[in-house]
Swiss-Prot record:
High-level lineage: Bacteria, Bacillati, Bacillota, Clostridia, Thermoanaerobacterales
The name this protein goes by in its record: Pyridoxal 5'-phosphate synthase subunit PdxT
EC nos: 4.3.3.6, 3.5.1.2
PANTHER family: PYRIDOXAL 5'-PHOSPHATE SYNTHASE SUBUNIT SNO, PYRIDOXAL 5'-PHOSPHATE SYNTHASE SUBUNIT SNO1-RELATED
Keyword line: Glutamine amidotransferase, Hydrolase, Lyase, Pyridoxal phosphate
Reaction(s) catalysed by this chain's protein: aldehydo-D-ribose 5-phosphate + D-glyceraldehyde 3-phosphate + L-glutamine = pyridoxal 5'-phosphate + L-glutamate + phosphate + 3 H2O + H(+); L-glutamine + H2O = L-glutamate + NH4(+)
This protein's GO CC annotations: cytosol; glutaminase complex
GO terms for MF: glutaminase activity; pyridoxal 5'-phosphate synthase (glutamine hydrolysing) activity
Quaternary structure note: In the presence of PdxS, forms a dodecamer of heterodimers. Only shows activity in the heterodimer.
Xref: NCBIfam families: PLP_synth_Pdx2 (TIGR03800)
Pfam family name, one: SNO
Any one of the GO BP annotations: pyridoxine metabolic process
HAMAP family reported in the protein's UniProt record: PdxT
Length: 191
């Protein structure tokens, strides 16, 4: 199995390191033709407007959207969650827009408002998951086809819809491998 990581801006190296710890081969994605070489893809955290612009500039936006709609497993963290959302509150920024969610950007506040919290995520295990939130979004609305996996103060911070998994937090910034393992075992192999 080979997982692509969008490698234009943001925390792509940290995702690669986490996947390597799980024994998963990775490929840095920067060109549309690379999409045929992977079994799943991660869209990392970073700055969603910048990543969206770069996806357009590198002619990756449409091919990536088509591959995801055709069933390519995708995991979007923070900015990646924003880019996968069909709707972004008060924004018309470029996005992939494949997941039936509405998100609010920087919803937990600015950089100084970043925080960590232990999350209950039964889908990934009984023990709480340490979640790192940095200028994080959250999900305002989901369609019935979207499974809510985790909340913080009644705000949705992790969800899944078929081949699409999103989190408002950064699992790649902790030593806990369970979220990435869930993506590989349940989303990629579970389809």
């Amino acid at each position: 199995m080979k997982i692509g990581v969008i490698a234009m801006q943001g925390a792509f190296r940290e995702h690669e390191q986490t996947l390597a710890r799980l024994g998963v081969e990775t490929l840095r994605i920067r060109r549309p033709e690379q999409l045929s070489q992977i079994d799943g893809i991660i869209i990392p955290g970073g700055e969603s407007t910048t990543i969206g612009k770069l996806l357009g500039d590198f002619n990756l936006m449409e091919p990536l959207r088509e591959r995801i709609l055709s069933g390519l497993p995708v995991f979007g963290t923070c900015a990646g969650m924003i880019l996968l959302a069909k709707e972004i509150e008060n924004s018309n920024q470029p996005r992939i827009g494949t997941m039936d969610i509405k998100v609010a950007r920087n919803a937990f506040g600015r950089q100084v408002d970043s925080f960590e919290v232990d999350l209950e995520i039964p889908e990934v295990g009984q023990e709480p998951v340490r979640a790192v939130f940095i200028r994080a979004p959250y999900i305002l609305e989901v369609k019935p086809s979207v499974q809510v996996l985790a909340k913080v103060d009644d705000k949705i911070v992790m969800a899944r819809q078929d081949n699409m998994l999103v989190s408002a937090f950064h699992p790649e910034l902790t030593d806990d491998l369970r979220i990435h393992r869930y993506f590989i075992e349940k989303v990629c192999k579970g389809l």
